[in-house]
């Protein structure tokens, strides 16, 4: 397989490296295409699992990289990306909690930081030319490092399939454990795991049991419900079952508690940023419990107009995160608005976990606007029901005038 040598002056490239077939082939392709440039492999540890990192450095060096930087981003990812996004109430197209989307800006930022550290003049990613991630990564690169060249092999090389990649590596005697048959495309981090491809490409196919890897099948989940307590401060989960935990530890504990109950599974067909639709199955056990708890506290503490505003902020934030616009003035504005609203989002919630469901069944807050004295229908001294008559007349004044004018 012939490779065109571009000899463009690129001397050192930082590659977002996973150790999979694509990025294993990218390393020798870069060296051949860009005049034997130096390749620095970079891997972001965002909680995808230790098994994904074992032997990664050795694999990168064997493929031709001169260095491999594995950067631990787990705590920062949850604290500075997941928690702020969840506080806005962001949920894409009503169902997707943005697990993959939220990870892209922190990975891109860390990749740029490694590039600056090693003096690289180019960045490279292995995203396909059909997906969202190419836009997310390159949008972040544009905001953080507009001076660095971006290389996207899937938009440049002539290889079209896994068979092509395997043949390419075999020609160069580069070993890989990958095979031509890859049923699903998966992406995992501390928050979730996504599944695409294979049988899922036909929306008439029900996902088989083999699709799901993180959560139990709700049909096989325990017949006994489990209750979990979450304490929230300023829109952030700080304690689980009374235990004070860091953001990452809290998420991991909730994942471990909720996954056996089949909590957090969704099967959706979403609108990609690039215009096409795609089907994905997502597992987000701990995040689903957190989301339920935060919304329960908001029901107690946010007045009608504040909650409407929070919903608008969440809708904007969902599209912004999905579309890869984290490092923008709009993102800063939305996060600032959310922080203001979250000042009163404090309290405790008990969530019931049962066969795929996470339901907030108890909630209390020192900032609660709910008052039993005001809300009950019995006789009381704090609310005179006669006051409602004047309010209703003023509230419906425009409708009254419109009707009178129509006569």
UniProtKB/Swiss-Prot annotation:
Traced from the root, the source organism's taxonomic lineage reads:
Bacteria, Pseudomonadati, Pseudomonadota, Gammaproteobacteria, Alteromonadales
Which Pfam families does the annotation name?
A: Arginosuc_syn_C, Arginosuc_synth
Name the CDD domains for this protein. Answer: ASS
Reactions performed catalytically: L-citrulline + L-aspartate + ATP = 2-(N(omega)-L-arginino)succinate + AMP + diphosphate + H(+)
Leader sequence range is: none
Task: Give GO terms: molecular function aspect only.
Answer: argininosuccinate synthase activity; ATP binding
Binding of L-aspartate, residues? 128, 132-133
User: Per its record, how is this protein called by name?
Assistant: Argininosuccinate synthase
